[in-house]
């Protein structure tokens, strides 16, 4: 009985936490569809088209775009 109550409380807590920390609960699916439509019209806007940097190329520590890791401003 205690375990069941604890599980119910945990599920309720996690559900409330999910709703409280959601980015945008209003029209969330609509925004996703608009973004997908924009990416279909403009393929360059898609994140799938971004090229990762090969080993030895210069990278940025804060926004690394390496295929592997960014170590001391160079891709590894």
Curated annotation (Swiss-Prot):
Family matches, as Pfam families: Conotoxin (PF02950)
Propeptide: 23-51
Broad class of where this protein is predominantly found: secreted
Signal peptide as annotated in the record: 1-22
Keywords: Calcium channel impairing toxin, Disulfide bond, Ion channel impairing toxin, Knottin, Neurotoxin, Presynaptic neurotoxin, Secreted, Signal, Toxin, Voltage-gated calcium channel impairing toxin
Subcellular location: Secreted
Cysteine pairs bridged by disulfides in the record: 52-67, 59-70, 66-75
Highest taxon of the lineage: Eukaryota
Swiss-Prot/TrEMBL domain comment: The presence of a 'disulfide through disulfide knot' structurally defines this protein as a knottin.
Protein role: Omega-conotoxins act at presynaptic membranes, they bind and block voltage-gated calcium channels (Cav).
Protein name (record): Omega-conotoxin-like TeA61
Protein species of origin: Conus textile
